[in-house]
């Protein structure tokens, strides 16, 4: 039995590796925009968990005896969910809106083993620094935040611009180890069953 990560996120992979797990990487290809459109008016936690579940369910049939993990993260600011900015221009615009403010990073998790599944969202409060225009532009040009929910990272250059967080740090990076541990326990498994070091 292995852990299968239904994601190509380097951050999610890093979290698992640092926690002693070498997962099988099997990115799921789902139409996120179509799923979000179907969920118009839904609560933010439901949106991120449904995206995570779609990813896990897309590949779970190919891994019937393995633990499959799907995840999705979005930033909630002023009642609006924000995913990845994709461009330096969008990153700069978002940072000008969020600097000096507080927002919530919501990570949806779907952990499946055969027909069993645990679906849960974790929410962490982010206190953004009042970053200068020069730093915002340099950060955007670095390319680092372009593929990150909320246009920031906690574990790399973005760490300069986060004053504090309240909640689970691993969830902010992309995958809550406490959520995964609870799911494993509910399946009668232990986290240490998957350690490779």
Swiss-Prot record:
Necessary cofactors: a divalent metal cation
Subcellular localization, as worded in the UniProt entry: Cytoplasm
GO molecular function: nucleoside triphosphate diphosphatase activity
EC number: 3.6.1.9
Transmembrane segments: none
Active site: 72
GO cellular component, one term: cytoplasm
Record's catalysed reaction(s): a ribonucleoside 5'-triphosphate + H2O = a ribonucleoside 5'-phosphate + diphosphate + H(+); a 2'-deoxyribonucleoside 5'-triphosphate + H2O = a 2'-deoxyribonucleoside 5'-phosphate + diphosphate + H(+)
Assigned keywords, A-Z: Cytoplasm, Hydrolase, Nucleotide metabolism
Principal location: cytoplasm
NCBIfam families tied to this protein: maf
Role played: Nucleoside triphosphate pyrophosphatase. May have a dual role in cell division arrest and in preventing the incorporation of modified nucleotides into cellular nucleic acids.
Protein name: Nucleoside triphosphate pyrophosphatase
Species of the source: Corynebacterium efficiens (strain DSM 44549 / YS-314 / AJ 12310 / JCM 11189 / NBRC 100395)
Upper classification of the organism: Bacteria, Bacillati, Actinomycetota, Actinomycetes, Mycobacteriales
